[in-house]
Amino acid sequence: MRNMITMGEFIVKKQADYPTATGELTSLLSSIRLAAKVVNREINKAGLADIIGSMGAENVQGEVQQKLDVYANERFKAALEARGEVCGMASEEEEDFVSFDSELSRHSKYVVLIDPLDGSSNIDVNVSVGTIFSIYRRVSKPGAGVTLEDFLQPGNRQVAAGYVVYGSSTMLVYTTGFGVNGFTYDPSIGCFCLSHENIRIPEEGKIYSINEGNYIKFPDGVKKYLKYCQERDEATHRPYTSRYIGSLVSDFHRNLLKGGIYIYPSGTNSPNGKLRLLYECNPMAFLVEQAGGKASDGFGRIMDIQPTALHQRTPYFVGSTKMVDRAEAFMREFSSHEDPANQG
């Protein structure tokens, strides 16, 4: 039996490798870890606690807010504000960014962007959901209020990113730019413990994840790629397997471990795609690149996109490098940015 290493111990050990580290990022990750435990507890008893279902209101995306969406947003907001390591937060559930105004917070150097509960519409049927987070250094002067520009940074400036998947077991996966590590929650001791060290995504996979019910709305490049995935060819081990849960965190997590590609393209009714660049696509892109994979909008690197709006959307292709490369080749050959279903 190997020695159990908690996430806290792992982070402190890594921090010791950098003598100039101040410990602020370590404390920030601890706050996220704490909030994840609280949210996990509520998800596990959701059917008994009258917090399943809709609030009857819509968030800024025009999506009906689930009760747990609101709960998770408040828990992460409270945890991030409490210790003062964050000067502001942007969330899928908030129309504008949130500024933390304590003296300690105003002098902190980090901002967090978060999707507090991805896939929450699946909770009623007991399907896995998750939390996605992204951390940047602010660009505004410490001591002053946080600004929109602090959040509108390209993904290549992220200092950390990760997700929590609340499933048959609860797991937190994160990167600080030095590889990807996963920690499984042990409820008997109340700690996330190292279970997946130095995760590497297979260069090639056999799984494609996309909502094929929207096929008629897809750009031609995606349609051609799907046909390629479904064709029989022993040399390339096709046809591939279609697996789509409908929760970005769950689909991404499976493909990260097993190899595969997740696609949410533009469509005739959503020319800019559906997924949010800043707090869904960029953090997953940082993770997959650190694990040896690739993330694209179909034509170029996701993390090189300069954001212009807090809730900006983008088409998304993420997963095993060779699969994303091949999907991009189909997009370049059969689609263009000018087509109504391909405007990124």
Curated annotation (Swiss-Prot):
Organism domain of life: Bacteria
Binding positions (Mg(2+) 2): D115, D118, E280
UniProt-annotated location(s): Cytoplasm
PANTHER family: FRUCTOSE-1,6-BISPHOSPHATASE-RELATED (PTHR11556), SEDOHEPTULOSE-1,7-BISPHOSPHATASE, CHLOROPLASTIC (PTHR11556:SF35)
Keywords annotated in UniProt: Carbohydrate metabolism, Cytoplasm, Hydrolase, Magnesium, Metal-binding
Complex and partners: Homotetramer.
Pfam families listed in its UniProt record: FBPase (PF00316), FBPase_C (PF18913)
Cofactor, how bound (note): Binds 2 magnesium ions per subunit.
A biological process from GO: fructose 1,6-bisphosphate metabolic process
Family, as annotated: Belongs to the FBPase class 1 family.
InterPro entries: FBPase_C_dom, FBPase_class-1, FBPase_N, FBPtase, Fructose_bisphosphatase_AS
Main location: cytoplasm
PROSITE patterns membership: FBPASE
Gene Ontology CC annotations of this record: cytosol
Binding, substrate: D118, G119, S120, S121, N211, Y244, K274
Organism for this UniProt entry: Aeromonas hydrophila subsp. hydrophila (strain ATCC 7966 / DSM 30187 / BCRC 13018 / CCUG 14551 / JCM 1027 / KCTC 2358 / NCIMB 9240 / NCTC 8049)
NCBIfam families for this protein: PRK09293.1-1 (NF006778), PRK09293.1-3 (NF006779)
The protein's Enzyme Commission number: 3.1.3.11
Cofactor: Mg(2+)
Catalytic activity of the protein: beta-D-fructose 1,6-bisphosphate + H2O = beta-D-fructose 6-phosphate + phosphate
One GO MF term attached to the UniProt entry: fructose 1,6-bisphosphate 1-phosphatase activity
Stated name of the protein: Fructose-1,6-bisphosphatase class 1
Pathway the protein acts in: Carbohydrate biosynthesis; gluconeogenesis
Binding sites annotated in the UniProt record for Mg(2+) 1: E92, D115, L117
